[in-house]
């Protein structure tokens, strides 16, 4: 069967060109790979020939998307432990150094530094030092535990010549709540809503979670895959554009904002939890705010919801993080089918160690103010229409989405960048007695640096 990019793929029944694609595609693109322990290495190339030999050697340490999917299936059946993940990405400068034809996405060609003004990012001079330098490649080494990652790191280092330098390094460390769901440092379930590219994953979502009646998570392959132009056969060899951004979270500041908002709105007792939910769009346990006024619907965390019953923003504010970055057909600027095309496969991981429980009832002063955050990672088929669109046109745009009364909701309170103003909230869930907060929600997430990469096919790496 040929590779049909216009729909989802059943990997178990894939044959012909579709099977070849899976055998030559890197893991973690179509389906997330476990990476509770993650090492990220940013590399520079000093000698093109040695860099090519190094990349060729890395291909021998990598597994295919198909192998990863088979490991996941085996783990479900027998609890068999899979192999660690090694992902490889190249920047436009890396391609130029290798003397190889690079993918043509204009944002990729320009690089992340060129997007600073567009995305309202901090100036490059304010980024952490290694992100200010020229980066040619990224390696992702991930697994459920630290041991396999250390072993894989040693194998990578054994292949690395002196002319391939480690420009910088990051370490990811997964966080989970008492229910075992992954959370970010503000304490909220993260990564629950994802575009699903595999038919088997869509079926599992329908049959084993809260369903797919109000929100269909399926997405066509063309939303994440592009032909690999430098591979031996781009009709069956595919890759994906990869965004990496280090986002530091000031947990203390965010928890102060939650406290102050609850005070401004006169929320009492357990209803004070709704203050944070109005910023995020979900309660800490993942319960969607548009679905109910209190936490508790978390087994499993729900994703089958829309904003059709909340068209006035009386339950979940229009500016809540998850409503801004996935309006679920309610944004008002585009037809729902066009709006969906901006969604991307997010593969982020938290970083930084802390001594407090993110979900404990503690005063803000006991929360970390720096050195923790999110290593934001996402796969795209079009950087300008997915990641950059989401950040610039949705999160940073005070006029999006479009409420019926024509008002401006304001920035995404979590990841929005730009001038902030006080925003409106419903002191009573589901009622139209809107009140305005006294002060703007402070920016508690700071971008510390990043880059754009292309994750090529295994066939390309072997051909070097």
UniProtKB/Swiss-Prot annotation:
Reactions mediated catalytically: 1-(4-hydroxy-3-methoxyphenyl)-2-(2-methoxyphenoxy)propane-1,3-diol + H2O2 = guaiacol + vanillin + glycolaldehyde + H2O; 2 Mn(2+) + H2O2 + 2 H(+) = 2 Mn(3+) + 2 H2O; 2 a phenolic donor + H2O2 = 2 a phenolic radical donor + 2 H2O; Reactive Blue 5 + 2 H2O2 = 2,2'-disulfonyl azobenzene + 3-[(4-amino-6-chloro-1,3,5-triazin-2-yl)amino]benzenesulfonate + phthalate + 2 H2O + 2 H(+)
Cofactor remark from the record: Binds 1 heme b (iron(II)-protoporphyrin IX) group per subunit.
Enzyme Commission number, as recorded: 1.11.1.16, 1.11.1.19, 1.11.1.7
Amino acids binding heme: 321
Protein location: Secreted
PROSITE patterns per the UniProt record, alphabetical: DYP_PEROXIDASE (PS51404)
GO cellular component: cytosol; extracellular region
GO molecular function, one term: manganese ion binding
Active-site residues per Swiss-Prot or TrEMBL entry: 203
Any matching Pfam family: DyP_N
InterPro entries: Dimeric_a/b-barrel, DyP_N, Dyp_peroxidase
Main location: secreted
Stated pH dependence: Optimum pH is 4.5 for the H(2)O(2)-dependent oxidation of Reactive Blue 5, and 5.0 for the O(2)-dependent oxidation of 4-methoxymandelate.
Summary of subunit composition and partner proteins: Exists both as a monomeric and oligomeric species in solution; the monomeric form contains no bound heme cofactor and is inactive.
Function: Displays both high peroxidase and manganese peroxidase activity. Is likely involved in lignin degradation. Also has a Mn-dependent oxidase mode of action that expands its substrate scope in vitro; is thus able to catalyze the O(2)- and Mn-dependent oxidative decarboxylation of 4-methoxymandelate to anisaldehyde.
NCBIfam families for this protein: Dyp_perox_fam
Stated name of the protein: Multifunctional dye peroxidase DyP2
Record lineage: Bacteria, Bacillati, Actinomycetota, Actinomycetes, Pseudonocardiales
